Amino acid sequence: MKISIKDIFQKPELFYQKKIVLNGWVRNCRYQKKLIFIDLNDGTFLENLQIICKETKTKNIETAAEITEFHENQKVNTKNESPNNINLEKLKEMLQIGASLQVEGILKATNNPQTPFEISAQNVSLLGASDFSYPLQPKKHSKAFLRQISHLRVRTKLFGAVFRIRNTAFFALHSFFQKKGFFHINTPIITANDGEGAGELFQLTTLNLEALPQTKNIPNASKLADETISKNEIDYQKDFFGKKVFLTATGQLEAEAMALGLNKVYTFGPTFRAEKSNTPRHAAEFWMLEPEMAFCNLSQNLKVAQEMLQFVIAKCLEQNYQDIEFLDKTEKNCLIEELKNISEEKEFLTVKYEQALEILQKSNTKFENPLFYGADLATEHEKYLTETHFKKPVFIVDWPKEIKAFYMKNNPDQKTVAAMDLLVPRVGELIGGSQREENLSVLIEKMNQMKIPQKDLEWYLDLRRFGGCIHSGFGLGFERLLIFLTGLDNIRDVIAFPRTYHNLVF
């Protein structure tokens, strides 16, 4: 039977003394005079499976006693077992780290607690050769080096664990919202609006910008083209969509429209930011999960966010315990304990922005970023609150309206908005959300104050004109969640093929 290494490690007793077929890649091999040991991994499980290969030579059978002994041995053999078909010299020639193999053999228990079972190989076939230039030889490699070979690094123990956890977390999020009665929707990748108001968007165009206003061969043409672009003198009516368009930074506005018809929705897809930052926290392409809920206020929004996070943590601990245990030992001490504690927390703390600011100002800690009312919290502030002061996740609510987006609902004090950020240890802000402004006149006034053209968002205002209601939602940066779940500290290490400033290889 053809099975995976994960199947064997989870329930080895089902396969003892049975002939099985495995495919995988060589992680390591060791040679003795009459034995070859192969560490095989197929990507389904953290640990390698040991394959033992030994050459069996056929003995000449001459006497009646030898004939009888031969037949008795055949009876003792399981009916699945057959003589080895292995030539050690030929096997040694084809074995290289990274090669892909198919192995047929019998799973046998051992007396070694470190290797409780192994495959006694009967046949080994080379599926894909490798050679000495394969960069993942059996030694320790830095993460910086592995980022240069993102197409191969998933074959390491570390990144195999990371991307198995990513898979579990991805489907756990879908599972949570489906169980809660949410509808999954697909929001546009190409958009004409800047939902976040940050202005750091990737623009799309079919116009030949290099030819504006003249060809590059003419002196100063590039400079003139840049000036033309900066003066906004390009006629985008001649472009594909007849206007400026961008890669989306959020699907929130469209999700609001869908929620005000389907009640509860979520979108989960790639988003793009053209931030020229080369830090461990920034990527140009990343994934966002954004739920939107009609008839939902801020406190209900917080409850959904907490339940979602705890559900995902529990699923990852259940399905990827060995992977997280490995990361606990190699990347972040006490990771399992921290995740368990958070998954079992009854109710996350909720603190107002002003209270958080006061805690930081009275901390006697020297921060690089200034603290004053109206200042956004920097990562160092967020980590102080979650790691030093509260030592647990905390919701920061009721933020100054000047530093939050136009669509967030004004509080009665008219100074703050019904916004929330969920801060967690090691990461800082994990989730950002708010109750949305449902009052049409207030929303128009806020757009005017922030100089947001009303004509571009008439459709968004229609959501308030026609049957508007209180509604709320939030955004979860998926890669930040993965940093939190894995104990890693760089966004480039939780995305298979990261796109960052001045870096796009694959």
Swiss-Prot record:
UniProtKB keywords: Aminoacyl-tRNA synthetase, ATP-binding, Cytoplasm, Ligase, Nucleotide-binding, Protein biosynthesis
The record, for SUPFAM superfamilies, names: Class II aaRS and biotin synthetases, Nucleic acid-binding proteins
| Known catalytic reactions | tRNA(Asn) + L-asparagine + ATP = L-asparaginyl-tRNA(Asn) + AMP + diphosphate + H(+)
**What Gene3D superfamilies does UniProt report for this protein, alphabetically?**
Bira Bifunctional Protein, Domain 2, Nucleic acid-binding proteins
- Record's InterPro entries? Aa-tRNA-synt_II, aa-tRNA-synth_II, aa-tRNA-synth_II/BPL/LPL, Asn-tRNA-ligase, Asp/Asn-tRNA-synth_IIb, NA-bd_OB-fold, NA-bd_OB_tRNA
Per the record, its GO cellular-component terms are:
cytoplasm
GO molecular function annotations of the record: asparagine-tRNA ligase activity; ATP binding; nucleic acid binding
Which superkingdom is the protein from? Bacteria
Instruction: Please state the Enzyme Commission number of this protein.
Output: 6.1.1.22
Q: Which CDD domains match?
A: AsxRS_core, EcAsnRS_like_N
> Is Aminoacyl-tRNA synthetase among the key words of this record?
yes
Q: Which GO terms describe its biological process?
A: asparaginyl-tRNA aminoacylation
What does the UniProt entry say about where the protein is found?
A: Cytoplasm
Q: Which PANTHER family match?
A: ASPARAGINE--TRNA LIGASE, MITOCHONDRIAL-RELATED, ASPARTYL/LYSYL-TRNA SYNTHETASE
Listed HAMAP family: Asn_tRNA_synth
Give the UniProt family note. Belongs to the class-II aminoacyl-tRNA synthetase family.
The subunit field of the Swiss-Prot or TrEMBL record says:
Homodimer.
Put simply, this protein is called Asparagine--tRNA ligase
Which species is this record about?
Onion yellows phytoplasma (strain OY-M)
